Amino acid sequence: ISHRFTYRNRMISTKAIVLRTLRYSDSRLIVSLYTEHYGMITSMVRIASSSRGRGGIAIWQLLNILELNVDFRGNSDFQKIGEVCITAPWKDIPYNPVKACVSMYLAEFLYNCLRNEGENAAIFSFLENSLCWLDETEKGIANFHLVMMLKMTRFLGFWPNTDEYCKTGYFDL
């Protein structure tokens, strides 16, 4: 008796933030993404070799917010990604050297904080809003990374008690 299995298209659309890219070969990247519906996932993606090809390396720039289709298989180390598009193209982050440095630092920080984190819509929303604010803001970003890290502590389960704040006090772990 032969059995024929029909697999439905299991691609699910989700938003994702690029946290790490690693060149695997001339035509492939290993990307780590924090997604809205699955938390941290890793995928091997093919990049276009020609300048006119779709899906070039620019779409996988650190902290890009993407809309993608994922065939999520919980038992697999690498998830299969279908269509990908940038939801909010950065206007200033890639072109402003200060913001570019801050974004590289934050990508590394977030990767290390979230690599074992599961699905958390509140974290994803916080990150998406914070990154959009960074891109749109002209001034006052000198301490953005510090404020963002401080606010992330609440999501990670520890945060400073500021109820008894005084000017001579300081945060000491």
Feature locations, PLM:
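Non-catalytic alpha-helical scaffolds and adjoining flexible linkers that form interface surfaces
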Residues: Y7-L29, Y34-L173
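Extreme N-terminal basic, low-complexity initiation segments
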Residues: I1-T6
